[in-house]
Each structure stands twice: as C-alpha cells, then as structure tokens.
A protein has these predicted regions:
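Catalytic cores of DNA base-excision repair glycosylases
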Residues: 2-220
Length: 221
C-alpha cells in the first residue's frame, strides 16, 4: 500500500498546489454546505445565487416562509428538507449563541468545533469538515464521494471504511498544513482519472502504487 505522503507528492507533481481560497463568512459557508448535500457544484452554486438574490442576510433566510425558501433553492434538489434544515440550524445557532455567528469556532480546538457543528440539524462530519477547513483553516479533512472512492482504491483507507471513519483516518495520516491541498487534489484526480464507476487506469500516473489497478481481477490492467 502506498503511504499518504507518496500519494500526496504524486498528486502535487500532476496537479500542483491549489491556490488558497478566500475565507467565506462562516454562516454563509454553512448554508452553502447544506445546499451542496446530494447535488453537484453547479446546482449548489445556482441555488446559492438564487438565495442571495432573494434574501439579504442569514437572518432573512431564517425568518423566511419555509415554502418560499424551498422554492428559491429548488434547483439544488431535496429543497424542502434543505430549507427546513437551513432554518433549524440558523435558529439553533442564534438560540445557543445569542447571535447568528460562528466566529467563536475559531477559538475552539478541532474536535470541540466538530462536535459543536455536528450537533446542528443537517450537519454531518463532511459538512462540518468543509466549514472548518475552508472557513477557519482548521485541519479537518472533508470526505466527499471522490475522496472516498480514490482513497479506497489506493488503499489509504480500509476496505470496510465508512464515510464517517474515513474522515478520521485521513485526518490522522495527513500533515495539518497539507490537508486542504490533499483534499482538493484527490477530488481533481477523482474527476479526471479515477472516475466512477470505471476509472481511466490507462491515463493514471499512479498505477505502479495502486492496489486497485494491480489486483489480478482488474480488467483494466
């Protein structure tokens, strides 16, 4: 099995080091994450643009008619559930903190911040990791469908790993200062080469270290 360091370095050689993102407002980042659940980036972005077009602030979103809110974000799919989750999460933030702000998470350690976020309605380990990594630059490792697939094929996580356990395995194995880079480059590789359901192994630069490719039952060898 290849080491995380080896895979990270191979990916860096191919895809480079991703540019750092501007830190979004944490509450708006949470809203985007809820919109992104079970949809693609394009639909998430369209739903978020429609949301920002109709409502000026997170408080306006929280106070909106739920059916109207759901209609506004319908392009994201599961819009009724997402509208309810969004408003419930915002209401819980304000109830517990006295304001619609997540800035206090910056002062928490990683595990404490994760626990606080995953206690919100509709926020699981991946959603919490996205907010903490992209907004607060904490070493939380988001595991989406691409990261999960590529990591499993490369043997970086156990065969029986779940999405939830994969977060912990990859977080522990990845240096804090390379979590964002590794996350982004695994996604790039998953979209370009290590696709589902059939990967483009003939185009891959890691076949010499990939257990999935080297398996005797792999017809793409």
């Amino acid at each position: 099995m290849p080491s995380v360091d080896t895979v990270m370095d191979r990916l860096r050689e191919e895809y480079g080091v991703p540019d750092p993102q501007d830190r979004p407002d944490p509450v708006l980042s949470l809203i985007q994450v809820i919109l992104s659940q079970n949809t693609n980036d394009d639909n998430r972005d369209r739903a978020y643009a429609a949301l920002m077009d109709r409502y000026d602030t997170p408080r306006d979103i929280m106070a909106a008619d739920t059916d109207e809110l759901a209609d506004t974000i319908s392009v994201a799919g599961l819009h009724n559930m997402k509208a309810e989750r969004m408003q419930a999460a915002l209401e819980q933030i304000e109830a517990e903190r006295g304001e619609l702000s997540l800035a206090f998470l910056d002062d928490m350690d990683l595990e404490e911040a994760k626990d606080w976020l995953t206690d919100l309605p509709g926020v699981g380990p991946k959603s919490a990791a996205v907010v903490l990594n992209f907004t607060f630059d904490k070493a939380a490792f988001p595991v989406d469908t691409h990261v999960f697939r590529v990591s499993k094929r490369l043997g970086l996580i156990p065969d029986d790993a779940t999405r939830e356990s994969a977060h912990d395995v990859l977080e522990e194995a990845t240096p804090d200062d390379r979590v964002y880079e590794f996350h982004i480059n695994l996604i790039r590789h998953g979209r370009a080469v290590c696709t589902a359901p059939v990967p483009h192994c003939s185009d891959c630069f890691m076949t010499d270290i990939c257990p999935y490719f080297q398996d005797d039952d792999n017809p793409r060898k």
